[in-house]
Structure formats: structure tokens, C-alpha cells
Amino acid sequence: MQSVLDLNTNAHLPVVVRDSRITIGHTTYEVGAVRITESASIAFSQLIAGWSTSPIRMPLAGLVFQVSKELTSLGHFFPLIHILDSTQRSEFRTRLNTLLQNNNMNITYTTATGVITPPLIMRVLVLGQIISCFWGRPEIIDALQQTVPSIALYADRQHYERAGGVGGGCYLPHEHRIMLESNRLFEGFYTPIPNVSPFLHELGHMLDGTHMRLERLPHCYGRMPLMRPIDVSLWQKAKQREVHCYAAWYHQRPPANGQMPIGHPYVFQNDGEFLAGHWEMFWRNPHTMAQMTPHVFTAFYTYVNQDPRDWLSHDYTGYVDGNRAFYQSGQQPWPSELRYDVTPD
């Protein structure tokens, strides 16, 4: 019996192939297809062939794109696509192809055989997220390219650490390079609502490094490139309010209304982490950010000229829940080491 799966509801499921059978989620199939659009499907046999030649495992949506090259299959990774009309989707495809062909956006993949060009799905996952973030301000992508950034992906932990990678991912400001294990690109996409995003976090750091280069500064200041006067003003106000709130919890005098920072103490350790941590949360829990810290939300919303709530119906709440639990636990927050765009209490 033929089975037809709808990609929209199954995009996040893991895929395993064994003995010419494909297991999607917890169900194994012998024949059938995945429906990509109302008029297009891709056969399980094609997915089996694609899975067998892929160097990395990924959710169903990634495998469908790897085999079909159909832009709409990327909606799970770039939910912005869901609200674009046909003309805008064509523009998204054009911007993506332009970046794929641009040597100023260098993406590498280190494996046991050496440094190679990453599979298309990896490059698309990186560049598509950048396009999505700056759909409303494409000139920021131009500025990013001007500084010739690089994204170094590694086949496994061993290659990552051998190259100098630390933690779950890192950004080297003076080399203008993001370093990341390749499987972490897909890590947060195995749930219906995308969750953790190491790449978005490191992209926040890269924006800081881009600002440093464009302004010819000696080091990063926790700012983003092409910030207009209104962006700077909103960012300073948002940062000051969060630092003031954090200081109240640090001194064990939390506000009477119970207001707490949306960010973990980790993001208050330096200006770069403050930017990167809140940047990732803006894209993953915009509804909660807009409600809990509207000043931070407004600063990002104004800067990128778009609202993620337009295409995200629900937040990933893992970060916020964990951070709230920390402040409510009575643990002592760490001292804040923020230096820029804030004044001491």
C-alpha cells in the first residue's frame, strides 16, 4: 500500500534507511512519497538514495531539499517562507543563489579527507538563515559580505577541537570566523517548533565582529553593523533597562513586580554575549520577549525591520523557562561585566 506523507506536519522527523526501507519518525515504509506542495511529491526511493549518499543526518525537510531542490521544502528551517507570496519566494531564491555564488561568504567543511565544499543543504541552511534574518534590511547582508566572513563546519567533535574549536560553537573575532560542528546546524530542527540554534547565536557574535571591522574598532563592542541613530538609541535603552533589572537580582533586591531579566546570567558576562544571547532569543521566542522585555524586542524589531511573530505562531520556551528557573531558585547571579552602552547603577 502506497503511503503519502505531508511535509508540513512531518518536516522535523528523523530519517533512517535500512534494508531498502525508510523509517521516518517511528514508522517504516517500503513504498510511497512525501508531498512537498499541492502539485509536487518526492518518492521514498529518491529519499533512500539521497540518504545513502549524504555525509550527515538531518530531519526529513533537509533530506527532501537535498534531493528535490524545492524551496518550499525549507519552510521548517526558514518559516519566513510560509508568509511570502510567489514573487517574494522567487526573490528569496534569487538572493540565496547570489550568496551561494559569492566568494566573500566562505563556507568550508572539514572531514577526514580534508577541507571541502559542504553539501548544498549545509550551505543553504547557513545562508538561508542569514537571508531570513535580514529580509527587511538586505543592505546588512551586503555589509556582512564586505567584511569577508567565514563559516567553518566540522564533520565531528574531533576535527572541531583539533582546529581550535571550544564549547558548542564559537566565533573568532580577529579571524571573523564561526566554527561549528556540522550536526549542530540541524540540532534544533528535530521538533515541530525549532528550538536551540547555535548558528544564530554565533551569527550574533559575527554581527558584532562585522561592526568592529566596518567601524575600524580595536575590539568588539556588542553592537550590530549599520545601526542607525534610532537603532543605537533603542539598543542603549534596552540594554540599560536589562542591566538595571539584572543588578537588582544580583544584589538580592528583585523588583517588587517580580520582573526578571529574560537572559541567563551567562549573557551578562560581556557585551558580546549580551548581544548574541538576546539575538538568538529574538528569533526563537519573540512572543515571550515582546511581552516580558518589550524594550529589547523593539530594539531588534526596529533594527531588522521585521517581526518574527508574523511567521512563528509559538515560541520555543526552553531558554526562557530555564532562565526563569535560575532567578527563582535563589542562586546568586554572576557579576555583570558589561562595559558599553550602559551606565553604572
Residue locations for each model-derived region?
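A short secondary-structure junction signal
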Residues: 162-165, 182, 189-194, 208-211, ...
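Structural motif
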Residues: 86-87, 114-121, 265-273
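Auxiliary, metal-adjacent structural segments of Zn-dependent hydrolase domains
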Residues: 93, 101-179, 187-191, 306, ...
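Post-HExxH zinc-binding segment in Zn-dependent metallohydrolases
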Residues: 210-267, 272-273, 279-287
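Active-site recognition of the HExxH zinc-binding catalytic motif
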Residues: 194-211, 276
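Pan-zinc metallopeptidase signature
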Residues: 254-345
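Non-catalytic architectural context of zinc metalloproteases
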Residues: 5-116, 249
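Short, hydrophobic/amphipathic alpha-helical patches that form generic packing surfaces
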Residues: 79, 98, 123-136, 273-284
